Amino acid sequence: MTTENEITALGEFNKKFENTYELFKKNLENDEEVGASFAVYQNGEVLVNLYGGYRDRDKKNKWDQNTIVNIHSTSKGIVAMIVAKLIDENKLDLEKNVADYWPEFANGGKESIKVKTLLSHQAGMYGWRQPIDETDFYKWDYVVDLLANQEPYHKADEKICYHPKTIGFLVGELIKRVTNKSV
């Protein structure tokens, strides 16, 4: 069943999920969210694929089914499971250097940073030394190249410093180098 609402909610859903659609629509109509997408697939079947609202707070640019967003922390659980699976399959070794999988990462004096050091936020790679714009977050190759080529902010294993903006790129690129697939 395909649905279109004059106000904001668009998409398709299995009729068993009509309540999900109604909650999504209400959320947008009540201005609880400026814009959003929500999709659920089971065994390749679309159960819910909803989107709507706006891409900006000024409500000038509508959210469409192809709107790309940076999901930040929501990917951490998925990434952790992928890393655990790669370790279990002996495709990734916590004791090996990141550069063994991602050779360019060795630039800037990072040749001896271990996978476990990167995963535990002790690599000193919590930011970009070169100023970047928020729109750069959508340019994967650009931001991972910057990270690969820069020096760390401190010596690896010297201290723990949360990598909130870079960890997704760092571990995501490591996974990509091991599996030839993006997260």
Predicted regions and their residues:
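Short, conserved catalytic-motif segment at the N-terminal edge
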Residues: 8-71, 93, 149-150
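Alpha-helix C-terminal capping/helix-coil junction sites
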Residues: 28, 87-88
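Catalytic-site signature segments of enzymes, centered on catalytic residues
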Residues: 129-183
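Short, contiguous pre-domain boundary segments
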Residues: 1-9
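Glycan-recognition surfaces in beta-rich domains, encompassing non-catalytic CBMs
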Residues: 84
